[in-house]
Amino acid sequence: MSIITDPIADMLTRIKNATKRKHKSVNIPFSNKKLKIVEIIKKEGYISGYEIVGQGIEKKILITLKYKGNTSAIFDLKRISKPGLRVYTTASNIPSVLSGYGIAIISTSKGILTDKEARKENVGGEVIAYIW
């Protein structure tokens, strides 16, 4: 068993690999931050659903992936802010992903928000990832 230094990057990689292999679902080790990110991905329509399974140290998030025909709803995911190089943005400089076709996930003082929600709330923060 290896030590995961960036759990968010690990989660995004697991989702990306599962979509490339056309899996129906993927298991992610549980954390509250990951759960909030998964809730945003679900709300934006990139996954079919999720559920929390197990208890204690075995607690996981089971993500049900979404496909249209043979194509995944998620084209790609990219980790932006990393443990060695944090990326922050102000409210006036929030990035737009693929001219609005994708989403940026931003950790703000008001919680984890999409780029659209952060603009509406007029808050900046750490840019966690892009999804399109």
UniProtKB/Swiss-Prot annotation:
Keyword Nuclease: no
InterPro entries per the UniProt record, alphabetical: Ribosomal_uS8, Ribosomal_uS8_CS, Ribosomal_uS8_sf
GO MF annotation list: rRNA binding; structural constituent of ribosome
Keyword Cytoplasm: no
Keywords recorded for this protein, A-Z: Ribonucleoprotein, Ribosomal protein, RNA-binding, rRNA-binding
A Pfam family reported for this protein in Swiss-Prot or TrEMBL: Ribosomal_S8
Source species, domain of life: Bacteria
Gene Ontology biological-process annotations: translation
GO cellular component: a single term: ribonucleoprotein complex
Subunit structure: Part of the 30S ribosomal subunit. Contacts proteins S5 and S12.
Family: Belongs to the universal ribosomal protein uS8 family.
Reported function: One of the primary rRNA binding proteins, it binds directly to 16S rRNA central domain where it helps coordinate assembly of the platform of the 30S subunit.
Protein name: Small ribosomal subunit protein uS8
The encoding gene: rpsH
